Amino acid sequence: MNRVFLFGKLSFDPNKLQTRTNNIGASFSLACIDSSGFNDSKSYIRITAWGKVASFVLTLKPGDSVFVEGRLSTYKMNNRSDDPNSKATYALQVIADKVYRPDEENSLEQPVDKATVIDSPFLAAKTNATENELAQAFPISLDDEDDDINPILNNDSQLEEESDDE
């Protein structure tokens, strides 16, 4: 099972992504505090979202608290192209299926499959949930279409700098 649950604050404005088929995406860094209680270290996690989830993410600002549910994925980082000895490296990221603002009741509304089971840690099980309540609790993202991505990245160096600080 590949599921990730994160809570943290946006490190900087989300970067807008767009595929050749005009699918909208967003990538951002989430600053998460170590919850083990042993230290106060932060981890900066790269997160990518697609479709309606990305449209919602693009409205967020640095410092906004969000809850992210998704899955781990790898992505290829091309090193300097002018260096013939440079090899591609791979890194982990989270592909966000759901993004919630804990301080907003209607942070994201999307269609929901009626067969969805309520398993959110933030909602008590409710047998008479309305369609709108289910849609708010369990947004469904569009298929990941991360091929042929034309990223509009202007904050990746900032992400690396933040990761080195801690």
Curated annotation (Swiss-Prot):
A GO term from the CC aspect: nucleoid
Residue stretches spanning the membrane: none
GO MF annotation: an example: single-stranded DNA binding
Region (Disordered) residue spans: 140-166
InterPro entries: NA-bd_OB-fold (IPR012340), Primosome_PriB/ssb (IPR000424), ssDNA-bd (IPR011344)
Keywords: DNA-binding
Pfam families: SSB (PF00436)
Domain SSB: 1-103
Single biological process term from Gene Ontology: DNA replication
Quaternary structure (record): Homotetramer.
Protein name, entry field: Single-stranded DNA-binding protein
